[in-house]
């Protein structure tokens, strides 16, 4: 693999698509293609000392490679852009070169920024014009099933400007007044209705023009890209997520991810 994209077959469109900017960039043109952007510049301090979070090993393979393969597993995704740490693009390129990746998918590595939002913007800037649907995926969600990826893409194709996979909450959630110092008691101010709450996952899918507009307009710090689209006053829709698309943030998450991966390899030959 080189820095230049490898040739890949054109994405095959479904029978009918909604006529949105995500699917038809202009009258008479073929449907827009789908790319995935993976910001992988974070350090992941909650996992403890060691390599950056995206480069931590899972089943002997860096989590980033698992995340890249998860995006490429969808036949709709023909390009994956990995946004590396500002000083680590060369290392990430070498990492991708050293692992088997699908030949039908192109892979590009670009240096990231100081913040996640800046890194996603740099990933968007690297996309060729024919890509009108964009997935943004956390490198720390290495085990997302391909059915979830495809469900997000399908919802964007059907006309949604922004789509997030999500799962119902198992725990009751309390809204609190934050304590003045860590460890102090925090007063509860509300208990949201759990049936109306969802835990959001990735990949999140977008009409490209909508996501570019959001990143060019919203300057507040946000925890995900869909929140930026919400601030534009546009609709964000939820599709079913998956319990295995959890985020590896703490050491216990890594233990769970190892168990899930071991079960897949035993049962599915993954």
UniProtKB/Swiss-Prot annotation:
Arranged from A to Z, the UniProt key words for this protein are: Isoprene biosynthesis, Nucleotidyltransferase, Transferase
Catalysis: reaction(s)? 2-C-methyl-D-erythritol 4-phosphate + CTP + H(+) = 4-CDP-2-C-methyl-D-erythritol + diphosphate
Tell me which NCBIfam families the record gives: ispD (TIGR00453)
Site location (Transition state stabilizer)? 46, 53
Q: Which Gene3D superfamilies does this UniProt record tie to the protein?
A: Spore Coat Polysaccharide Biosynthesis Protein SpsA, Chain A
This molecule's function is given as: Catalyzes the formation of 4-diphosphocytidyl-2-C-methyl-D-erythritol from CTP and 2-C-methyl-D-erythritol 4-phosphate (MEP).
> Is Transferase tagged as a keyword?
yes
Pfam families (UniProt xref): IspD
What are the boundaries of the region Disordered? 1-33
* Name of the protein in question: 2-C-methyl-D-erythritol 4-phosphate cytidylyltransferase
Q: Which PANTHER family match?
A: 2-C-METHYL-D-ERYTHRITOL 4-PHOSPHATE CYTIDYLYLTRANSFERASE, CHLOROPLASTIC (PTHR32125:SF4)
Q: Where is the composition biased (Low complexity)?
A: 7-27
InterPro entries according to UniProt? IspD, IspD/TarI, IspD/TarI_cytidylyltransf_bact, ISPD_synthase_CS, Nucleotide-diphossugar_trans
> What PROSITE patterns does UniProt report for this protein, alphabetically?
ISPD
GO biological process entries: isopentenyl diphosphate biosynthetic process, methylerythritol 4-phosphate pathway
The pathway is:
Isoprenoid biosynthesis; isopentenyl diphosphate biosynthesis via DXP pathway; isopentenyl diphosphate from 1-deoxy-D-xylulose 5-phosphate: step 2/6
The Gene Ontology terms for molecular function here are: 2-C-methyl-D-erythritol 4-phosphate cytidylyltransferase activity
EC number assigned by the record: 2.7.7.60
Q: What class of enzyme is it?
A: transferase
Annotated site residues (Positions MEP for the nucleophilic attack) in this chain:
194, 247
Per the record, the similarity remark reads: Belongs to the IspD/TarI cytidylyltransferase family. IspD subfamily.
């Amino acid at each position: 693999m080189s820095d230049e994209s490898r040739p890949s077959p054109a994405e095959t469109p479904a029978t009918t698509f909604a006529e949105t900017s995500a699917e038809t960039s202009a009258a008479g043109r073929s449907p827009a293609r789908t790319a995935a952007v993976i910001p992988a510049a974070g350090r992941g301090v909650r996992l403890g000392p060691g390599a950056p979070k995206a480069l931590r090993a899972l089943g002997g393979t860096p989590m980033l490679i698992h995340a890249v393969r998860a995006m490429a597993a969808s036949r709709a995704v023909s390009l994956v852009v990995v946004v590396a740490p500002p000083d680590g693009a060369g290392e990430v390129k070498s990492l991708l070169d050293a692992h088997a990746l699908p030949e039908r998918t192109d892979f590009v590595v670009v240096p990231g920024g100081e913040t996640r939002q800046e890194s996603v913007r740099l990933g968007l800037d690297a996309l060729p014009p024919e890509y009108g649907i964009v997935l943004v995926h956390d490198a720390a969600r290495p085990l997302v099933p391909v059915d979830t990826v495809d469900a997000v893409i399908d919802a964007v194709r059907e006309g949604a400007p922004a789509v997030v996979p999500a799962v119902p909450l198992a725990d009751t959630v309390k809204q609190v007044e934050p304590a003045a110092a860590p460890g102090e008691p925090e007063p509860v101010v509300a208990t949201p209705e759990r049936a109306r709450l969802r835990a959001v996952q990735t990949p999140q899918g977008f009409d490209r023009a909508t996501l570019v507009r959001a990143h060019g307009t919203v300057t507040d710090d946000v925890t995900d890209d869909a929140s930026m689209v919400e601030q534009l006053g546009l609709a964000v829709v939820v599709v079913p997520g998956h319990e295995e698309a959890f985020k590896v943030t703490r050491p216990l998450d890594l233990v769970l991810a190892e168990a899930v991966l071991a079960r897949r390899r035993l049962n599915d030959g993954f």
